[in-house]
Amino acid sequence: MRLVTRADFDGVVCGALVTLMEDAVDSFLFVEPKFMQDGMVEVRRGDVIANLPYHPSCTLWFDHHITNAPNWERHLGVLRAEGRGLSAQPNTQQPKPETPTIVEGKGGFRIAPSAARVVYEYYTTPGERREAGGNRQIQDALDTLHSERMKFLLDETDKIDAALLTQEDVLNPQGYVLISMTIDGKRPEDEPYWMKLIELLREAPLEQTLGDPDIKNRCQKILDDQEKLKKILLARTALRGNVIVTDLRGVKDLPDGNRFLLYTLFPGSNISLKIGDDSQRGNTTAISVGYNIFNTTSKVNVGALMEKHGGGGHHVVGSCRVPKRDAEKHIREIFEEIRE
């Protein structure tokens, strides 16, 4: 069994939960959502996909992104009237109310704060998935799953992935919030680090995880680079009405870290448009849009907007990847949609 997930904090926590409950997982594949959307990922029968768009060859699928909602009913074999196959046009309609959010042998989907929350519900919903039945290994895994340590990890994952953070969380990150900032899915050479995190988040309390030398060093670097990152953001950002426009194309050695720092610098604006180079495809530009987490007055459905441009996401945050030659056209169109 192989786990296919995304290298962000939510994806790593999904990995911790799935490997806790599925001892048959023997390999991992970390990919970005766009590669899955573009059909560039070979998925095979038996694969578990978590926190990524759907692929019809998988066995279990766990997700919570609104733009992926139509494919839950396809995964269950309940097809919409508008046709077969994967959704090719923007469609953020949620599954019918009577459609179950958890199905044994299929996985789970709902618009939850995190994909990890959906995975957790799959393995803890009474009668749906696992009962020990005298099996000591399964009982130990269930005990861990129901522990206060794991419940706290899930609560923190919800908070991080849904951006339910305070200014103090952003300006003085600690604990799992700080650890989440050390994960950069655009660096495949970091895969051993992601694997280490999966194991520690599954097996160890927060204090032990923070005490690991590698994690400790990465966390300290995030804190040390915060001022450098702030200066770069201020130099590369323009305030255009209600929109924070940050253009990081051409910036070398951008510090890792705090994606929410921008909102502490421009608290009056309600949405951001960030443009950057796609580090994995040289002919591609990365575009992301997100509500200001401290000023959520925008009315834009960001996920639906990004889907129009070949991407996806949630109601309040999303991204897309576009060819460089077409980037300015997409940027103009997106800006016009989000400005007030």
Describe these PLM feature segments.
Residues 162-171, 176-259:
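Glycine-rich, Lys/Arg-enriched anion-binding loops that position phosphate/diphosphate groups
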